[in-house]
Structures are given as C-alpha cells and as structure tokens.
C-alpha cells in the first residue's frame, strides 16, 4: 500500500462516517414530521421482521402528520402496533386502510434529551474519524519502518491526514449544530 492509497482510503472512510452520521441524525426526532423517522421500525410480516417501508407507503400529510398506508389491508393492525410500541413516543390513529401518525409537540425536557442524543451521535462520529487518522498514521509509520517511504513523506502524509480530519470534524460539528437548532426550534 502506498501513501496515496492510504490517503485515498482514509478520505473515503471519513466520508462514510459523515454519511452514517447524517443517517443517524435523520432518525433523531424533531418537532416536525419526517418519514425517515419511521425507518427504524420493523413489522412482523408473515413471521419475519421487515422494515416498515417494505410493507407500507410512508408519506407526509402535513408538517406535523405522517401517513402510513400498508399495501395489504390485513397489515394495518400490525403496522399500527409496531409504531405504537416503538420508542419514538408516537400514537398512530387508524382510518381504515390509512394510518395517521401525528407528531406530538415535544416538551422542553424531551428536546434536551434529543439534543443530547444528537451530540452523542456527533461525538461517536468524531471518535471514528480520529481512529481513522490514527490508523492512517500507523500505516505510514509502517511504510517508513519497512523503508518503502521516507520520513519527509511521512510528515507530509500526516499533515494531509490531519487536514482531512479537521475538515471532517468541522463538518460533523456543523451537522450536529444544525440538528440541535432544528430540535430546539419551537
């Protein structure tokens, strides 16, 4: 593995950490309705647990209401039960073959919990990025030790990896700050 390969791999993995953070933050509840909020819910479908999106159509009715329309009418009760039993604190209402999921307004305490959860997700991503930096630096040190690269190359690579790390951590901070602002908006 060359220094260029190490940098390319590290950049790619750091980008994956950012994408994972975006997905995790999308699941953190804000005051507004968002169909991705229900992505983590699984429904019993003929004996196997499948994601809600595979048994129903999930859309927004308005800013505070999600509509869930199961493709099979027989699934309505199971879908409603799965949403109610999730840890999201939602109370779905069935209207025949359509299930309405109103978003209750969040209390100040719940907003603070969600903000803390968003910060924890951000911190986990920062740790992942820093671990990738450490792994890259160790790989370069091994190349120098094996005499496949010079110490000057090592210093340049470590500086480049540090710049990548700083850039990704700044992006993580921005994502978390935007999510916190979204959560705390009344």
From Swiss-Prot:
Its main location: cytoplasm. This is Ribosome-recycling factor. It comes from Delftia acidovorans (strain DSM 14801 / SPH-1). One of its GO terms (molecular function) is ribosomal large subunit binding. InterPro entries: Ribosome_recyc_fac, Ribosome_recyc_fac_dom, RRF_sf. Belongs to the RRF family. Keywords: Cytoplasm, Protein biosynthesis. It is found in: Cytoplasm.
